[in-house]
């Protein structure tokens, strides 16, 4: 990497080229075919003014270089240099670094040889968000692309437009396209990536047809098949769940990885060790127990002042282009589960007085098994407050008895607990999870949208307090009525918890007479100005209603584990971890047994400065608590029919636009404020994050020559460019637990990393912590050995099973038949066939066995089991252990008399201790 042999000897042939010259040429055309940009290439040979097209067209730039023997050329969009003679990307800094490298032979010898393919310093630009796009005035603004209605698909179009205008997600799909890899069908992430690229392309069409994504979502969830109108919130949940499933990656054990890197690192500065933030495996969160299972990066490259720098870090205003033509690489070939996890809760048995409880934040109880909300009682509608358990999140970890929370600024201290109670680890893992290694997953979806809620419930009889941490991806908020508002405001003014049932009782089951009265009242209300009926409902009121304390009494009493009976209780909930983008769903639709209706009440929501500080738990470590509105989805019509549109703020020019299927119209912000919001997307706002990016831009512009360059995760750099709180540097996305590159990632490692100069790396490392520091990439030999050993193990196990099962099938009358649980067998089969990386736990026949009155175990009637031979059972049991052993033994009894000449076949189930 730093070897002088890697230096391009042709850099001296570059003539004097100014930034203004390059910008002027970028507005021109190919001198051979007349095609316009982007991605024109300018020859850098002295006194050569040629500008040619790239591989996207006829590639006249290459033809010119080969004919004229002009070796160096620069991309007029990305300002990256390519040498045809060396067949690699080159950097102007190498001319400055050459004397230093030449005088440091010791360093050159120690440096590792370059990899088999050139690794690129990726141009990701960070510029001032306030800069105008004057250099691209001749181009239409990006992201203003409509979507054709495919037949009652406005619910999908509005949701996609709202997501498309979430910069962290869009920037990921535009700038980190190499990370969008999946072997899972229907590869919805690929369809979404293609759609985002079309919507945000500089030469965008007036509208696109999202056929591929529509077809994919119908394969995932049959509910969306046909042409019936659907709920946009259900579509959002289903889409994001599937994107997470396809993009999820196992979380590497950070502690082991840090130790592995530290053992090889030349920098052991104790100060840096103290500055490191808690790693990602210290997040405190768990799965939601929701029963609802399914539910900008826009590129601008030309105008950066760092046109000749090795590192251009893109900004959230979208001035960096997506890397479709990153370099002219003729040498390199591109060849080569958050599963349905068990619930993991944080429960605590705590004796505390009500007086002490009053001093604590209001936190709530875990939901009942059929509840879709951590803080509300079940309601007969189609809404869910928390995400489905099909999307696990960052798991619960404990170190020395203290639960730690990750924070964005570097900090390593354990979380500050509330004085009246202490969280303790609950033993609620299922039998399978105890026996099988727990695997944790994360994805860009969970990084952006996942938050967590701390729920607390107290028994009013014994004062037992239990806590649960649950992950949410959206908050479904009730819309309080006039009476509810009075109760909420009264509780606020008196500084006491709101009266329980503030928003639940008003929507209780209604009789026919009550229904008619309610229907007439709602019709009259909809025709009467809101000022006539009372105060306007605000989004803060909806949040207060959601987080208000609830009494558990009557039919909703709390089942106390200490009292062993139903008791009256109180439940609270607070936000434990704020998401980068907060999705809020207003519960406008009510679906009762005999009818449905829509709540048309106007809910006032802020465009800027939504503050969630009043709803945070004391343990919350999020430093930024204010949010600005990104987009809002609106529904016009009734509960039975209607139309969806979206209002979104364009990240480039800050203007608001209405997206109505294929029509996009600029609107004033007052139109947005008066809209009847249904789903709202808010983004964390931080001036400090913008200043931090500007500081990194300044450091990159200094172009200080250095002996070392560092590799950083491209995905984390995208977080730095678009997140208000990016968190610690997470190089674990391209490293294994041993500190090397996993063999299966090495062939596309340049898609996973970005090269940073030393001064930029040191600034980011000192500011955010994390890591580990990486300035040498190598394939992990330990992982390679493990992969080979795993493949050998799989081959031996499956070959042995096939051999034993073939012999078993050849037996006409086996003396004994062993039973094995098909659930366990399917897990083992997935492992040996390579569909699952984790081997199954011990054999678990408990699902197919039942105990007789005498204590013996027999096969359960109707059980899901398979029949195997004694030899096969012995072989599998020797590898995995477990049980119980269930054998159906066949024996022929002695004849009882002449009338029974053929004997009697007796079949009994036997159980042996394992």
From Swiss-Prot:
PANTHER family, sorted: UBIQUITIN CARBOXYL-TERMINAL HYDROLASE (PTHR21646), UBIQUITIN CARBOXYL-TERMINAL HYDROLASE 20 (PTHR21646:SF13)
Binding of Zn(2+) 2, residues: 30, 33, 53, 60
A matching Pfam family: DUSP
Cellular localisation: Cytoplasm; Endoplasmic reticulum; Cytoplasm, Perinuclear region; Cytoplasm, Cytoskeleton, Microtubule organizing center, Centrosome
Organism: Homo sapiens
Keywords (A to Z) from UniProt: Cytoplasm, Cytoskeleton, Endocytosis, Endoplasmic reticulum, Hydrolase, Metal-binding, Phosphoprotein, Protease, Repeat, Thiol protease, Ubl conjugation, Ubl conjugation pathway, Zinc, Zinc-finger
GO terms assigned for molecular function: cysteine-type deubiquitinase activity; cysteine-type endopeptidase activity; G protein-coupled receptor binding; zinc ion binding
Assigned EC number: 3.4.19.12
Top EC class, one word: hydrolase
UBP-type zinc finger segments: 6-111
Primary localisation category: cytoplasm
Subunit record text: Interacts with VHL, leading to its ubiquitination and subsequent degradation. Interacts with CCP110. Interacts with DIO2. Interacts with HIF1A. Interacts with ADRB2. Interacts with USP18.
SUPFAM superfamilies: Cysteine proteinases, DUSP-like, RING/U-box
InterPro entries for this protein: DUSP-like_sf (IPR035927), Papain-like_cys_pep_sf (IPR038765), Pept_C19_DUSP (IPR006615), Peptidase_C19_UCH (IPR001394), Ub_carboxyl-term_hydrolase (IPR050185), USP_CS (IPR018200), USP_dom (IPR028889), Znf_RING/FYVE/PHD (IPR013083)
UniProt keyword NAD present: no
GO terms under cellular component: centrosome; cytoplasm; cytosol; endoplasmic reticulum; perinuclear region of cytoplasm
GO biological process: antiviral innate immune response; endocytosis; negative regulation of canonical NF-kappaB signal transduction; nervous system development; positive regulation of autophagy; protein deubiquitination; protein K48-linked deubiquitination; protein K63-linked deubiquitination
Encoding gene per record: USP20
Protein name: Ubiquitin carboxyl-terminal hydrolase 20
Domain of life: Eukaryota
Lineage, highest ranks first: Eukaryota, Metazoa, Chordata, Craniata, Vertebrata
Renumbered residue ranges of the record's region Disordered: 257-347, 360-415
SMART domains, per the entry: DUSP, ZnF_UBP
Residues bound to Zn(2+) 3: 43, 48, 64, 70
Basic and acidic residues composition bias: residue spans: 259-279, 316-332
Family: Belongs to the peptidase C19 family. USP20/USP33 subfamily.
